[in-house]
């Protein structure tokens, strides 16, 4: 998102949401009412959490609706309802209100707060995905480096290049890796 050309207001909103996500608490502009009558108190601090597989399953089930068609009853899933169900489950708390929020509470948000919350959860998801990609990418890079080292070792020992070793079927490649490991101990 940083690479896009955002207008000054959009960039300011983006930067404030990023800073708040990093601090662990997102601030609502207008707040969410808690309580009734004179006892109503506005809640502003939102804590987000990662969705679980159970959250995703529950959101999908909640987004489905049974409708009648010419062929009989059919389950239809609403993408917008799925998004709302995921959003409400991703909210750990808003002030003293524990999540997941009910749809009735989501409806009480101002348009600005709803949009801010939607953007924040999207950015939060992107940050989580990026961190997972970096972790897994690092694992893949280490694995790839190990494979290339093993292929080079096999190529040196068998007097051919690493390309030959990498073109082998995996079972033969790993068998040669084991042989190269054993042989390299004797060639030191």
Swiss-Prot record:
Q: Which GO terms describe its cellular component?
A: host cell cytoplasm
Provide this UniProt record's keywords sorted from A to Z.
Host cytoplasm, Late protein, Viral release from host cell, Viral tail assembly
Subcellular localization, per the record?
Answer: Host cytoplasm
Is Amino-acid biosynthesis set as a keyword in this record?
no
Induction conditions: Expressed in the late phase of the viral replicative cycle. Expression of late genes is activated by the viral late transcription activator C.
**One Pfam family linked to the record:** Gp41_Mu
Which residue stretches, if any, does this entry annotate as coiled coil? none
Instruction: Write out the GO biological process terms.
Output: viral tail assembly; viral translational frameshifting
Q: Which domain of life is it from?
A: Viruses
Its biological purpose is as follows: Required for tail assembly. Together with gp41, may act as a chaperone promoting the assembly of the tape measure protein (TMP) and the tail tube protein (TTP) into a functional tail shaft (Potential).
Q: Which family does it belong to?
A: Belongs to the mulikevirus tail assembly protein family.
What protein am I looking at?
Probable tail assembly protein FS-gp41
């Amino acid at each position: 998102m940083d690479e896009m050309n955002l207008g000054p207001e959009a960039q300011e909103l983006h930067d404030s949401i990023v800073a708040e996500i990093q601090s662990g608490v997102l601030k609502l502009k207008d707040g969410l009412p808690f309580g009734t009558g004179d006892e109503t108190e506005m809640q502003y601090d939102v804590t987000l959490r990662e969705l679980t597989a159970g959250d995703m399953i529950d959101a999908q089930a909640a987004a489905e609706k049974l409708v009648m068609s010419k062929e009989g009853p059919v389950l239809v899933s609403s993408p917008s309802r799925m998004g709302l169900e995921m959003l409400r489950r991703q909210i750990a708390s808003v002030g003293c209100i524990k999540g997941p929020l009910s749809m009735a509470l989501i409806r009480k948000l101002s348009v600005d707060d709803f949009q801010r919350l939607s953007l924040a959860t999207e950015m939060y998801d992107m940050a989580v995905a990026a961190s997972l990609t970096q972790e897994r990418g690092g694992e893949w890079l280490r694995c790839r480096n190990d494979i290339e080292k093993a292929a080079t070792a096999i190529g040196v020992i068998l007097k051919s290049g690493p390309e030959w070793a990498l073109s082998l079927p995996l079972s033969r490649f790993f068998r040669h890796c084991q042989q190269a490991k054993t042989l390299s101990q004797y060639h030191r």
